Amino acid sequence: WKLPGVITTSVGYSGGKTINPTYNEVCSGYTGHAEVVRVVWDKKIIDISDLLKMFWECHDPTQKNRQGNDCGTQYRSAIFFNDKSQEEIIINSQKAYQKALEKDNFGEIQTEIKILNKYFYAEEYHQQYLASFGSRQYCSASPTKIKLKDFENCNYKLKDEIWDNFNWEVDKCVLISTNE
């Protein structure tokens, strides 16, 4: 997530019942966990509205328990928030994105939205995966190519030109950068 104000990201597992799951356990489908991204951001530079814009636009939230060719509950679309005050803006963004999707005949958003129970850091080899050599061929998050416009209580802080670094017309990863 090469967005101004994003301090760090890490991938992990959340939403399930198993304590400290391994990747293989999560892939079994028996843990109940989803593969997730933890985002730490500077609220003075970037708003949760901007992060929600990125979230909705960079994958297909209408797919249930899958992203692209990756199938299973561990690949479900989910937002786990850790501050109850964030719930309203998340729901507002979901409603606005659903309306935008309906205009292009997409189905219902399947994204799970709930308070974060526990986050488990994934194995080191999963961290910053998209920055690793050759990862782009496999990346299967397929964007809908539908953009999230303003929505109730949104407070976008990033300028429009920031979003020019993303190509919403590609079928897989949308970040424009060198990664052979």
Roles of regions detected by a PLM:
Residues W1-E180:
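Flexible coil/turn and secondary-structure edge motifs
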